[in-house]
């Protein structure tokens, strides 16, 4: 049986937001994992601990042949050898035209966004909606000539675009409607939905006949994660053993957690499939059949293996030596904690503070929230490569080693 990895030829790829969490991992994959071959780019992980020993990623994902460029607002951090870097503002057509004239990309992968917890509504709309519109129009040639023609545009949307942040979601597919307006309580999700719609409507509508698609990651985590993994470990570091035994809800709620490397892989697959589709259109062949179409489509991306929310949380704690056995758990009902969270928000809000316990955190800890990724499997050929438990070990190991190194530096 052959062990040769498949190869994807992608031409010149511009990763927008390539110095961010997901963007960095996409660049790493496009460059065939310099993080595993170049000591200057290595991801920190604890040494001599079997819990944090895992096989190399470069032997498991397809090999990419690509020239890689990155544009970000600032590119001084999270750089990888082998990519070229450009500072740029996606809300400025002039700024983007200068980058496109220098790079001349065949493919754009657009991951740039403010943090999901960002409460600045004008910033979210300016970057996620106006910035995406500017970027897709520049890529498609509608904002001026930059000396080339972009063939494919992959947008990183969010699984939250179909969620009202309150309802349970059970094996949800891409046919569910986008949630906006009064029903959408998360403004971030509303702006991502608006941006996704802009990108998909632009499919084959530009002067360059550029094809587009959108990916909707669910529950992203992994090395360099500053949301789920970091916050879960921050809580366990500060909480007493008694507090760690407290569980919001019954832990009967399945939840999607998706390793960042698998999400990056879905982006490279989408880019590859779009290139093939663009060539098909350009050569005068018929349009793809509806059940195989990639362009103009949105795709859920998951690990295809939802887990119980608190099992994932306690597994992260256990990797740092803080083990909570099932018989030690104290279940706290959502019906009681939700109102308490509301009171805490009101009281501390008057003081300009945000409580740890909010109605949002209570609901998220107790809701069922997982998606079907069958469409990505059938049309993109996507399969999660790294399982949930390995992804968690990678994510936790990164945080643990980063904190150890920071402690050593502080002690000097």
PLM regions and their residue ranges:
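Amphipathic terminal alpha-helices
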Residues: 2-4, 371-379, 383-412
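N-terminal Rossmann NAD(P)H-binding glycine-rich loop of SDR-like oxidoreductase domains
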Residues: 6-40, 44, 48-63
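NAD(P)H-binding glycine-rich loop region in Rossmannoid oxidoreductase-like domains
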Residues: 77-79, 87-130, 134
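Conserved Rossmann-fold NAD(P)-dependent oxidoreductase catalytic core, especially the SDR/UDP-sugar
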Residues: 134-188, 213
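Active-site Tyr-X1-5-Lys
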Residues: 183-213
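NAD(P)-dependent short-chain dehydrogenase/reductase
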Residues: 204-275, 316
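Conserved C-terminal active-site "lid" loop/helix of NAD(P)H-dependent oxidoreductases
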Residues: 260, 267, 285-288, 298, ...
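Mid/C-terminal beta-alpha module of Rossmann-like enzyme folds, strongest
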Residues: 273-356, 406-412
């Amino acid at each position: 049986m052959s062990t040769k990895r498949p190869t994807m030829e992608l031409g010149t790829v511009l990763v927008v937001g390539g110095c961010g969490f997901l963007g960095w991992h996409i660049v790493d994959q496009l460059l065939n994992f310099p993080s595993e071959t170049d000591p200057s780019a290595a991801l920190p992980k604890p040494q001599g601990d079997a819990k944090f020993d895992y096989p190399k990623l470069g032997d498991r994902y397809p090999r990419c042949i690509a020239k890689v460029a990155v544009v970000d607002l600032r590119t001084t951090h999270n750089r990888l050898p082998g990519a070229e870097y450009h500072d740029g503002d996606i809300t400025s057509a002039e700024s983007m035209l200068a980058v496109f004239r220098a790079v001349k990309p065949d493919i754009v992968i657009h991951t740039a966004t403010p943090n999901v917890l960002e409460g600045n509504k004008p910033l979210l709309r300016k970057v996620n909606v106006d910035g995406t519109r500017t970027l897709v129009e520049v890529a498609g040639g509608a904002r001026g000539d930059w000396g080339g023609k972009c063939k494919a545009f992959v947008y990183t949307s969010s699984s939250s675009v179909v969620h009202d942040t309150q309802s349970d979601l059970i094996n949800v597919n891409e046919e569910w409607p986008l949630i906006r307006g009064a029903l959408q309580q998360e403004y971030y999700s509303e702006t991502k939905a608006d941006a996704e719609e802009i990108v998909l409507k632009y499919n084959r509508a530009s002067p360059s006949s550029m094809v587009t698609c959108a990916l909707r990651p669910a529950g992203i985590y992994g090395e360099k994660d500053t949301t789920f993994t970091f916050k879960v470990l921050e809580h366990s570091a500060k909480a007493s053993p008694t507090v760690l035994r407290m569980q919001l809800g019954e832990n009967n709620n399945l939840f999607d957690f998706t390793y960042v490397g698998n999400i990056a892989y879905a982006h490279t697959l989408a880019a590859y499939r779009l290139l093939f589709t663009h060539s098909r259109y350009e050569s005068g062949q018929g349009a793809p059949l509806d059940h195989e179409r990639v362009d103009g489509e949105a795709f859920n991306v998951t690990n295809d293996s939802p887990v119980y929310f608190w099992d994932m949380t306690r597994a992260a704690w256990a990797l740092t030596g803080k083990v909570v056995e099932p018989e030690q758990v104290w279940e706290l009902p959502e019906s009681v904690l939700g109102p308490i969270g509301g009171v805490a928000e009101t009281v501390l809000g008057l003081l300009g503070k945000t409580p740890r316990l909010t109605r949002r955190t209570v609901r998220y800890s107790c809701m069922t929230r997982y998606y079907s990724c069958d469409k990505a499997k059938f049309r993109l050929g996507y399969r999660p490569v790294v399982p949930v438990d390995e992804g968690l070990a990678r994510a936790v190991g990164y945080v643990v080693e980063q904190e150890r190194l920071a402690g050593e530096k502080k002690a000097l």
